[in-house]
Amino acid sequence: MVFRRFVEVGRVAYVSFGPHAGKLVAIVDVIDQNRALVDGPCTQVRRQAMPFKCMQLTDFILKFPHSARQKYVRKAWEKADINAKWAATRWAKKIEAREKKAKMTDFDRYKVMKARKMRNRLIKIEVKKLQKAALLKASPKKALAAKGAAAVAAAAAAKVPAKKITTEGKKAPAQKAPAQKAAGQKAAPPPKTQKGQKAPSQKAPAPKASGKKA
């Protein structure tokens, strides 16, 4: 980037240290390579010689003649609205934030910490929502799987023991008890025995007594 902040008549500078630190001045004349004649009619800085070491040049330039009187400098300053333009720059905002931070108490720093934590929590929640929406939009298969997992989680949270839900989100088929054989159906044949093994002997039922005991 080309350097454009040159020492010239009308250049507005920021005083970084010294008795007038934090104020803006305009260069009225250059005395030598180390000092300049400055004036700050709108910042309560009287016309005086000031070294370049304590000045930082800004991007603002006023149009007034060489070694102009204070009323011409004031008129050019107010016409260019230097104070409002300076307050809107990032440079001025950083200086103001630094001063506010230096004046903060322990309780103020605690409130700032809590506010930052709350802000970060809200940002994380919104980011997760956006990521989930993008995932569902990109792959419909993963969307169906996510819905099935959500259904399983909801069923587990509800704690319904009667209804068993599989991982696919469907009910498990109920097992029916074997029905009893009808009276007219024949019994199944006994299993075949291998050679060398005896067939299990079936005992005949005992005959019922015709007469009752005394």
Swiss-Prot record:
Annotated region (4 X 5 AA tandem repeats of Q-K-A-[APS]-X), positions in chain: 170-189
Keywords annotated in UniProt: Acetylation, Cytoplasm, Isopeptide bond, Phosphoprotein, Repeat, Ribonucleoprotein, Ribosomal protein, Ubl conjugation
SUPFAM superfamilies: Translation proteins SH3-like domain (SSF50104)
Predominant cellular place of this UniProt entry's protein: cytoplasm
Biased composition (Low complexity): 172-214
Disordered: annotated segments: 161-214
One record GO biological process: translation
Post-translational modification Phosphoserine, affected residues: 139
Gene Ontology cellular-component annotations: cytosolic large ribosomal subunit; intracellular membrane-bounded organelle; organelle membrane
Stretches for region 2 X 3 AA tandem repeats of K-G-Q: 192-197
Subcellular location(s) of the protein: Cytoplasm
Cross-link entry Glycyl lysine isopeptide (Lys-Gly) (interchain with G-Cter in SUMO2), positions: 124
Sequence repeats: 170-174, 175-179, 180-184, 185-189, 192-194, 195-197
GO MF, one example: RNA binding
Positions of post-translational N6-succinyllysine modification: 85, 203
Ranges annotated as spanning the membrane: none
Residues with N6-acetyllysine modification: 79, 85
PANTHER family xrefs: 60S RIBOSOMAL PROTEIN L14 (PTHR11127), LARGE RIBOSOMAL SUBUNIT PROTEIN EL14 (PTHR11127:SF2)
Family membership noted in the UniProt record: Belongs to the eukaryotic ribosomal protein eL14 family.
Subunit-structure text: Component of the large ribosomal subunit.
Function text: Component of the large ribosomal subunit. The ribosome is a large ribonucleoprotein complex responsible for the synthesis of proteins in the cell.
Entry protein name: Large ribosomal subunit protein eL14
Gene (UniProt): RPL14
